[in-house]
Amino acid sequence: AFGAANPLPARAQGGLPTLGDGSDLTSSEERRLGDRIIRELYRDPDYIDDPVIGEYVQGIWQPLMAAARARGELSPELDERFAWEVLLGRDRTVNAFALPGGYLGLHLGLIGVVGTRDELASVMAHELSHVTQRHISRLLTQQSRQTPLLLGAMVLGALAASKNPGATQALVVGGQALAMQNQLNFSRDMEREADRVGMGLMEPAGFAPEGFVGMFDKLQQANRINDNGSWPYLRSHPLTTQRIADMQSRLPSGGLTASSPSVLQAEHAMVTARARVLSRPGVDVLRQWVAEPQGTGFAALPPARQAGVLYAAALGSSQLRDAAGARRWAGQLQQLVKNDAAATRLAKLLRAELELAADDAPAALAAMPPGDSRRPEMLLRTQIVLRTGQSKEVTGPLQTWLATHPRDASAWQAMAAVWNAQGQPLRAVRAEAEVHAARYDYAAAVDRFKAGQDLARRSTSADDHFEASIIDTRLRAVQSLRREQAAER
């Protein structure tokens, strides 16, 4: 499961920052701790970088970040020092979690159940507020009198398996029974503060505050009927009547308004459908989703919900190796959303993805929406032209993207494949090294940069001289980062 980890070895625990003086964890220490945790999550088989879902999530995350800056909730120091990255996990459980250093984790299971964009924004605003309010540092300071090893327990807690009903998750999981009760009590205060601060971000960021109440209603219903471990968010974020009442009282009318924009949009329905399918629900569930458009109740659904059903049926058919069925449902989807620009774009991307999965690269290229400057188009087009032998078409867009997004590991992977296809092994090796560096695996990055140096020494091409100098410079920089990383152990 995404976020699972085995206990840290004694050497790793001993190398964590100590809290003997009871002082707050500094922002630099918290960032380093977060980087260590995130390095393990990048290696987790459930980690997924899906460009379509990732772009949709970023479209929520960035306005929330801007609102936090504008309202003074996000200090310039934290803004500069923390990572502010969102990671996705394939896990089907409904969960989200904040990590040290400005990292946020979202399970596809949660994205798959949120009813509106505003509901997803409410979860992300809440988690963002856990970070901006320095809850991790505050809690560790409170607990440091009991045991400095609590920081090690916090690392384990942040990575605890979400499918384990006995694990108290999210920000902190105490490793010792003595500390547990105080942690839970403090957590309630944190939850209320994150609710209040997070809700204050919603309207300035362009989201309806009613999304908080809608999400709370959904969680409350799940709390009543579901106790099978699939909603760990309820354990890590205890839902109390006080929290619900507090959020309702903060709405202008004390409840949902008739003019609330919290309605289902086709784009959102399609993204949540994608999240459900990519969470690997199993063959039987996929078959149910594929059959749903033929059910008697499909015609009575609102158009936006129909779009989600058709998207799941098309992508599910593709995963079941039914290319004809995938094309049929994708065609119906495109017809349904033809007057909705955002949904039409997603439908075209899906059609291209399905054609590529069916091994018809020319059809995939023809199905692509115009332009390749946006990340989903750029990465999918790269996969397609690598099949058609036209990889030079994407070299420029990839290089332009990486110039402004140097930590995009997936883009570096695509760049490596493109350079290999064009017979430029030195550039490919450098790109492979950058993949590891972007995921904080500096040891592996150093190995690839050194391999690049060896390759450059054997090269007789004058064009490789410039690339070799880049490799030398990057190797020195990454070796320095590796030494810092080793010193923390």
Model-derived regions: residue spans:
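Extracytoplasmic and endomembrane cell-envelope/extracellular-matrix remodeling and assembly machinery
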Residues: 20-21, 47, 55, 70-73, ...
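Membrane-active amphipathic alpha-helices enriched in small hydrophobic residues
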Residues: 148-163, 170-178
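Hydrophobic or amphipathic, alpha-helical segments that drive membrane association/targeting
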Residues: 1-97, 180, 222-224, 327, ...
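Short alpha-helical catalytic segment bearing the HExxH-like zincin motif
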Residues: 105, 119-127, 131, 173, ...
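Acidic/histidine metal-binding catalytic segments
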Residues: 140-152, 167-170, 206-216
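Short pre-active-site segment immediately N-terminal to the catalytic Zn-binding motif
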Residues: 105-122, 184-189
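Catalytic Zn2+-binding segment of zinc metalloproteases
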Residues: 115-119, 128-145, 163
